[in-house]
Amino acid sequence: MSVESDLKKDGIEVIKKLDTLRVNSIARTVSNSLCETFPDFNLNQNDLFIKLSRLDMYIAKMPEGMAEANYFYKNTSIYFNDHIADEDLEEFAIHECIHYIQEIKDKRNYLLRMGLCDYTEFRIYGLGLNEAAVQLMASKVLAIPKEYVKYFNITFETTSPSYYPLECCLVSQLAYLIGEDVLFESTINSNDTFKNKFIELTNAKTFMNIEDNIDKILMSEEEIIKINNKIATMDDNSKKIDVMNKKIENLKSHITSTFIKTQKLITSIYFDNVFDSITDLEGVEKYRQKLYNFKDYLGSTAGDTFFNDYYVNKMMALEEKYNYLENTSVENVVDDSMYLTKKKTSKLLDFFNFIKSLFVHSDFENSVDIVKKWSFSRLMYQNFYNLQCLNSGNLLSLFF
């Protein structure tokens, strides 16, 4: 299919081509910004400027719901929505210029790979993962502050409130666990470092499931946009509209359930695996901090207590592991399961069981978000500690 046919199919109508001076200005700004933001990614500012200045850039009319800018690899061109102010073109060019830097083509100009996305003969893998990673990079370049948003009944904090927000939320979780620099380096240089690191800490099946689920979320969002655009052209009295609205609601429910399922998968697989690898007290503290801070990257829905329950269970298990490691030298560890030997239940363990029962059995009229719940838990622990004069002051910092 020709470029013209592709553009027509997507509803893109070219208005004008940007002149060389404007393209060079955008290329200079973007190349400078990328090199300043990511100094360790082997980006040469002069080489990058020359590369980006070879792009063709156009102003075009675009259908409702389409991204404000789009990169087309077939003719190495960027198309900007005509309602973008000229002084804002650089901002929207960053995401698309990263796509251009990412692309790997064969001798016949067929796209093989773009960052974290693989293009095979029959299917594209990792499109949602790559789009989210690129958007997170663009947000970092632009220094966009975090803000709370709510989409499809999911509330979360993000630096990308308008573009791929749900996908960015999930990929931010991966970046936190594996390392933001690892994610971004693999994204812009189109390599498997991030993928391999994640698989090393989890497994290949989990990576593929996460990758596939993020793609499903992206495709469902795109389908909703297409249906809404079609509804906009129909008579308000058309019976088909009811059917189409029902389909939209089903897609929204699918997006929500897929997001929550993926988030639970990321949480449980990663932290379960890392927990099993803890061999010293320093590892216990690092694990505690990482799991606690992970709450800041999560999306939440009304009535969902998964992370609360998971955190309490892991803190109880972590105390057992702490006690075992404190009393057993690493050299004497024969079987990791030894620390599970039945011990006398501590007051701290009793406390966490009590907190867990509150989360599991209480019937709140209004859902309390994760942060408030854990602030409450911390206060409860401190009060419990002060009242009971627990002989475990060293564990206060361990758990909070």
Where does each model-flagged region fall?
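Non-Sec secretion/translocation targeting segments of pathogen effectors
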Residues: 1-2, 134, 348-362, 368-400
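Pan-zinc metallopeptidase signature
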Residues: 155-327, 336, 341
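Extended low-polarity, hydrophobic cluster-rich segments
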Residues: 97, 255-270, 274, 352, ...
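Extended compositionally biased segments used for macromolecular assembly or nucleic-acid engagement
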Residues: 111-117
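Post-HExxH zinc-binding segment in Zn-dependent metallohydrolases
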Residues: 117-163
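Auxiliary, metal-adjacent structural segments of Zn-dependent hydrolase domains
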Residues: 10-77, 82-87, 107
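Active-site recognition of the HExxH zinc-binding catalytic motif
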Residues: 91-107, 135
